[in-house]
Amino acid sequence: MIDPKLLRNDPEGVAANLARRGFEFDAAGYRALDARRRDLQQETQTLQNQRNERSKEIGAAKKRGEDIEPLKAEVGRIAERLSEAETALNEVQEQLDELHLGLPNLLDEQVPDGQDEEDNRVLRQWGGIPALSFKPRDHVDLGELLGGMDFEAAARIAGSRFVTLSGPLARLHRALTQFMLDLHCREHGYTEVYVPYLVNARSLTGTGQLPKFEDDLFRVEHDPSLYLAPTAEVPVTNLVQERIVEDADMPLRFVCHTPCFRSEAGSYGKDTRGMIRQHQFEKVELVQVVRPGESWDALEALTGHAETVLRRLALPYRVVSLCGGDIGFSAARTYDLEVWLPAQERYREISSCSNFTDFQARRLQARWRNPETGKPEPVHTLNGSGLAVGRCLVAILENYQEADGRVNVPEALVPYMGGQRLLGD
């Protein structure tokens, strides 16, 4: 949520910033609605004061033995007007609350201008694209050759956009998860957490998935107050919901492995083959909660932590700064990590690392106690995938394949694979 004070003081400036996203914000309409709120607040306060004064007069008149019926009638009229004013104020406040929740975060000035992914800016690349002497197979064909990747079985169980893994591929999937968790906990200073996979609307609103993106979520029919978590960002960031974190405990760094569930409502016809875009997938998620003045350095560090996974696995990748038209609703700045997939001859997203500044914190009422003032202030929150496990598996299969369809195991994963160095032997 954008700072309400900033919104009231400079709605035109907010509108200009949000226009970089292609988002239209009616600053004049907001000013008029906010002025109406202030007028109604003043009116209700005045009427409350009048009611209280007349009530005191009734008590005094009663003691004097005077006729209090005229005063009681006046109090009744004031109460009726007060009720009408309070109803109108509540309606205006609801409109303002809905408007506030519908506004995306303000963009950082370093976010590139642009309309879509074509306008994103490549910041750096790492690793050479493998020069294969044969036409590379995609991960679906490799999975069929190796055995253990079955989309038909998953379709019988659950429908499209699911997969089952078995044998060495299931073990490789688990090895990736364990490797990522160990790396982030042992070397990057994260605390591993376990969280619910079901989340409520309050939590989804706090991180920004609701109310705008409800169509992307799976809702529990038996209990409509709950949703399947679309990303661990939601439950992990909500660990600080309605909390005041003491300065001595800052910053907080959490890592969490969870399944993620997405309806992919807006992705009809996209990536229908394979594991790239599924209803259920797994991620190792990184979340940081930091002091406001530290969040930009924290974004660089968090992005570096995700990059380390790719470097240890020797997977070629690039880092892209998302433009205003492509960046997520809650983010002030986002870096995407994109890994090279030989069969597609293109880079594909494997992680998004974002600084949300105080946007999520205001929705969550997540604060820290500033030691200089002793007062609670909104924290800054960040998150990024470290990494998406299924897409990482895809990248390993395609980048480490041999001409005969066998796949080498990255050196960093050999200990997690019980010493196995080659899939398909």
Swiss-Prot record:
* One GO MF term attached to the UniProt entry: ATP binding
Q: Where is this region: Disordered?
A: 42-65
Q: Where in the cell is it found?
A: Cytoplasm
The pathway entry for this protein reads as: Aminoacyl-tRNA biosynthesis; selenocysteinyl-tRNA(Sec) biosynthesis; L-seryl-tRNA(Sec) from L-serine and tRNA(Sec): step 1/1
Compositionally biased, Basic and acidic residues: which spans? 51-65
Its top-level enzyme class, in one word, is ligase
Q: PROSITE patterns under this entry?
A: AA_TRNA_LIGASE_II (PS50862)
Where is L-serine annotated to bind? Answer: 231-233, 285, 385
Return the GO cellular component terms, semicolon-separated: cytoplasm
User: Is Transport found in the keyword set?
Assistant: no
- Indicate the principal place this protein occupies in or around the cell: cytoplasm
Entry keywords, A to Z: Aminoacyl-tRNA synthetase, ATP-binding, Cytoplasm, Ligase, Nucleotide-binding, Protein biosynthesis
Record field: catalytic activity: tRNA(Ser) + L-serine + ATP = L-seryl-tRNA(Ser) + AMP + diphosphate + H(+); tRNA(Sec) + L-serine + ATP = L-seryl-tRNA(Sec) + AMP + diphosphate + H(+)
Q: Which InterPro entries match?
A: aa-tRNA-synt_IIb, aa-tRNA-synth_II, aa-tRNA-synth_II/BPL/LPL, Ser-tRNA-ligase_type_1, Ser-tRNA-synth_1_N, SerRS_1_N_sf, SerRS_core, tRNA-bd_arm
One of the GO BP terms on file: seryl-tRNA aminoacylation
EC numbers on record: 6.1.1.11
The record lists its disulfide bonds as: none
Question: What residues does ATP bind to?
Answer: 262-264, 349-352
Q: What does this protein do?
A: Catalyzes the attachment of serine to tRNA(Ser). Is also able to aminoacylate tRNA(Sec) with serine, to form the misacylated tRNA L-seryl-tRNA(Sec), which will be further converted into selenocysteinyl-tRNA(Sec).
Q: What is known of its domains?
A: Consists of two distinct domains, a catalytic core and a N-terminal extension that is involved in tRNA binding.
HAMAP family from the entry? Ser_tRNA_synth_type1 (MF_00176)
| Assembly and interaction partners | Homodimer. The tRNA molecule binds across the dimer.
Q: Which PANTHER family match?
A: SERINE--TRNA LIGASE, SERYL-TRNA SYNTHETASE
Q: Which family does it belong to?
A: Belongs to the class-II aminoacyl-tRNA synthetase family. Type-1 seryl-tRNA synthetase subfamily.
The name this protein goes by in its record: Serine--tRNA ligase
Q: Which species does this protein come from?
A: Halorhodospira halophila (strain DSM 244 / SL1)
